Every structure is written in structure tokens, then in C-alpha cells.
């Protein structure tokens, strides 16, 4: 039980990709990983079960003691019991495309109906992976879709597209965006929620080191009011290297490293910082992603970015067609730094 509790702490702090589980299911999934019984997890998991199991584990942030007791009492038996669903596909004992699969190295993945592959990593692998290794997913093609400045009136459209393709994304939140009530939907559907800025006023945010941290904490507190915790993943407004933060950047990053925050820039931009058509945004994305075996894609979620939403299905399809897996950013993800 202590190991399960530790893993629950990891998942609840970081979140993860995929479709949510119930609290009971999430605890059972974590119990399976903690006890090493990943094979039992496969029995009775059809496409829907696989998609749910793939990443809803971050919902254990709200797990109750009774849920933990369920894991303790049921052990692997509950996770391996046949599904009670009337869908015959859930009775398969051998996983097919669309069901949860656990490779030998400890990664679990599912392939959605659209052909997108989403990843859930075991807690052991998370602990074995660190930004300090400076290794960028050898042998794998990984795509991290990220949205700055949201949520907005476009958020539900974005979520609908992500769900259609069976992929998840990371939101870097603008605290005064006016649509923070969308955050629970983002979080509960298995996406990552992170800090961007509260005001996005560059001169104010970067006036001093203290001013930056005041803005960050104000944003984190606003997020916590919606989803119950303040994230530790961050994206600098304007990126970590910009025209406004040269005097304070070094001290801010040093303090982040000391206090457990992790910042992310990007290596692919869809170009929606300017006014472009959806086709142009797709073209910019493909041009920047060409030759990259892992991509952290910068996009924006705001009321004015309708063309970004229009371009999103084609952008996702490009990465699917080129063999990319999709994941959300975590504290141990390779650091995309300028």
C-alpha cells in the first residue's frame, strides 16, 4: 500500500495523458503497476477500457481512502476480472489495436481508432527518467501538443478534436484569460495543465525576479481554485529567451531548479502568433517538424485563434501519418529549452 500511495502522489502531482478513469479504476490501475501485475491489466480491456486506462490516473488527486482500500482488498483480481460491459470487444483476452498494451520496458500504450498512439508510462520508468540525462526519446517519435494563453471560448472545440483523434495535449494557462471555468474539463479529460502567466504583460512580469514569481504564483493560485492544485510545469511568456527578460532570466531559472519547477519552450511553432490561414498554419508546422524525431508544438488557445482550431485536425493527422506517439509534458520530460 505504501508503494501505491507513492505512485498516486506522483500521478496526482503531474497528471497524465488519456481518457479519465473513475477514482476506483485509477487506483486499481496504479495498484497493478505497483505490484508488477501489468499482464493482469490487459484482461477485459477493450478499446474504451484501454483508452480510459491509458491516462486517467491523474484523477487520483481526488482519491478517497475507500478507493485505496479497494486496491488493498481486491489486489490484482479486480483489475483482471472480465468486464461487465455488454460490448463484446471488451471480452477479448488478447489486446488488439485500440486496447491497452504494456510493452516489456514498462510503457503502456493504446492506438485510437484514428491511428494515433498515446502513451502511459509506469511510475518506475518515470523515476528512471530525468531531465538531467539530456536524452531525447531515442528510437521513438513523440509529439507534445501545447496550447498557450487558454482556456478560451475555443477550448471545447479543441477538446472535441483531441477526443476525436484520441490524443491529449498540454495547456499553459493565462490566469486572467476569463475562461478558467474550462480547466476542470481540460484536466478531467486527461490533458496536462501548466502555468504560463497571469497577465502576459511582459514589462510587468519581467520587471524583476520578484515580479516574475508574483505573476507565476498568482497564475498558479488561480489554477488551483479550479483543479485543486498549483502546477509545477511552466512556460515563460514569450519563451525563456526574449527581449524583456535578459536581466532576470538566469536568476529565475536558477530558482526554478531549486524549488522544483520545470520550464518548457518549444521546437516547433504552428505560426499562429500572426494572422495566417489554417492551411498556412499546417504548412508552417510541417516545415518546422520536418527532420525532428520529437516535437513540442506551440499553438494558442484564445478566442481569436479560430484558424488554429481549424488547422488542428490536419496537424494531428500529419504526426499520425509520420509515426509519432502523443504524450503530455511531465516533470521528467526532456527539456525543450531555447
Indicate residue ranges for each PLM-predicted region.
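Catalytic domains of cell-wall/extracellular-matrix polysaccharide-remodeling enzymes
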Residues: 157, 200-298, 302-320, 324-325, ...
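Short, compositionally biased "basic patch" segments
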Residues: 95-108, 122-130, 249-262
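N-terminal secretory signal peptides
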Residues: 1-22, 32-43, 49
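Twin-arginine (Tat) signal peptide motif
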Residues: 18-27, 56-57, 65
Amino acid at each position: 500500500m505504501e508503494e501505491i500511495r507513492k505512485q498516486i502522489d506522483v500521478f496526482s502531482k503531474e497528471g497524465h495523458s488519456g481518457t479519465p478513469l473513475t477514482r476506483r479504476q485509477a487506483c486499481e490501475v496504479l495498484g497493478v503497476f505497483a505490484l508488477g501485475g501489468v499482464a493482469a491489466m490487459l484482461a477485459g480491456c477493450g478499446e474504451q477500457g484501454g483508452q480510459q486506462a491509458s491516462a486517467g490516473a491523474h484523477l487520483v488527486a481526488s482519491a478517497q481512502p475507500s478507493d485505496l482500500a479497494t486496491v488493498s482488498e481486491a489486489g490484482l483480481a479486480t483489475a483482471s476480472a472480465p468486464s461487465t460491459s455488454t460490448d463484446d470487444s471488451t471480452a477479448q483476452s488478447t489486446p488488439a489495436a485500440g486496447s491497452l498494451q504494456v510493452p516489456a520496458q514498462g510503457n503502456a500504450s493504446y492506438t485510437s481508432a484514428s491511428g494515433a498512439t498515446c502513451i502511459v508510462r509506469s511510475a518506475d520508468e518515470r523515476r528512471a527518467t530525468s531531465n538531467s540525462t539530456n536524452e531525447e526519446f531515442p528510437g521513438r517519435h513523440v509529439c507534445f501538443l501545447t496550447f498557450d494563453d487558454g482556456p478560451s471560448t475555443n477550448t471545447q472545440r479543441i477538446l472535441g478534436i483531441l477526443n476525436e483523434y484520441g490524443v491529449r495535449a498540454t495547456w499553459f494557462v493565462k490566469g486572467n484569460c476569463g475562461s478558467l471555468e474550462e480547466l476542470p474539463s481540460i484536466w478531467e479529460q486527461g490533458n496536462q495543465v501548466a502555468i504560463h502567466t497571469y497577465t502576459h504583460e511582459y514589462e510587468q512580469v519581467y520587471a524583476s525576479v520578484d515580479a516574475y514569481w508574483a505573476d507565476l504564483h498568482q497564475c498558479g493560485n488561480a489554477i488551483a481554485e479550479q483543479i485543486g492544485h498549483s502546477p509545477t510545469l511552466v512556460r515563460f511568456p514569450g519563451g525563456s529567451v526574449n527581449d524583456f527578460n535578459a536581466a532576470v532570466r538566469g536568476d529565475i531559472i536558477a530558482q526554478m531548479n531549486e524549488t522544483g519547477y520545470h520550464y518548457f519552450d518549444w521546437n516547433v511553432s504552428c505560426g499562429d502568433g500572426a494572422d495566417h490561414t489554417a492551411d498556412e498554419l499546417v504548412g508552417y508546422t510541417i516545415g518546422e517538424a520536418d527532420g525532428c524525431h520529437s516535437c513540442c508544438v506551440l499553438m494558442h488557445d484564445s478566442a481569436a485563434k479560430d484558424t488554429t482550431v481549424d488547422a488542428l485536425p490536419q496537424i494531428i493527422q500529419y504526426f499520425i501519418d509520420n509515426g509519432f506517439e502523443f504524450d503530455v509534458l511531465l516533470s521528467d520530460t526532456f527539456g525543450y529549452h531555447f
